[in-house]
């Protein structure tokens, strides 16, 4: 019988306790000692959490995900496999980041200065992506900092977001444009009259005014 190689065997989760709070963390995860991980959070195989990052309680960080220095994640966030969250990103509660999505941090990237010298940290002006409560970033989407993704917004898979996104917006394309609205359930809303929308999943009603949507 063929025996699986060591690399083919999934890395087990361990349950470290910090001040009596349990977490599920893969033994292959790379977590800086200065990072803070909330209770109930799961960190999977080959994930990396950098120095002074904060991950709230009950989050899930998928295989190969990356959380940069000083990044902040609220509670109940889900970061899927190979998603990259670069500093100084801020994710509020309940944010979803899909597989291989990227949150950038350099508006005008260059490897070298105009003198041909390799850039150092001192030459780098960091800008971040802020994602508000309940928003979702689809697989392989790119959020180009500095931008803010509004509450409960949805960014479709593969989209490239270069501008701020309003609450409840459904954004599609490159560059991403609003093609509709979504409710808190994530389901696209149905328009009932020129200014009102209903969620077919929950029955919640919304009103659009001057390009912004609010829950009634």
Where are these regions (language model features)?
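Active-site/binding-pocket entry motifs
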Residues: 108-110, 177, 205
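Short cysteine-rich clusters marking metal-coordination/redox-active sites
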Residues: 183, 199-202
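Flexible, glycine/small-residue-enriched loop-and-beta-strand segment within the central core
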Residues: 12-27, 32-33, 42-148
């Amino acid at each position: 019988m063929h025996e699986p190689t060591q690399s083919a065997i999934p890395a087990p989760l361990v349950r470290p306790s910090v001040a009596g709070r349990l977490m599920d963390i893969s033994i292959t995860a790379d977590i800086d000692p200065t990072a803070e991980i909330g209770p109930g959070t799961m960190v999977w195989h080959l994930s990396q959490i950098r120095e002074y990052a904060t991950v709230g309680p009950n989050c899930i960080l998928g295989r190969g995900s990356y959380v940069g220095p000083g990044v902040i994640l609220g509670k109940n966030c889900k970061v899927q496999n190979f998603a990259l969250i670069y500093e100084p990103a801020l994710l509020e509660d309940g944010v979803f980041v899909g597989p291989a999505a990227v949150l950038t941090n350099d508006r005008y990237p260059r490897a070298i200065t105009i003198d041909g010298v390799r850039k150092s940290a001192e030459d780098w002006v960091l800008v971040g992506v802020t994602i508000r409560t309940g928003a979702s970033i689809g697989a392989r989407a790119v959020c180009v900092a500095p931008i803010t993704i509004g509450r409960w917004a949805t960014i479709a898979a593969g989209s490239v977001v270069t501008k701020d996104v309003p609450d409840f917006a459904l954004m599609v394309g490159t560059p991403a444009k609003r093609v509709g609205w979504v409710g808190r359930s994530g389901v696209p809303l149905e328009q009932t009259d020129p200014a009102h929308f209903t969620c077919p999943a929950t029955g919640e009603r919304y009103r659009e005014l001057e390009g912004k949507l609010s829950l009634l």
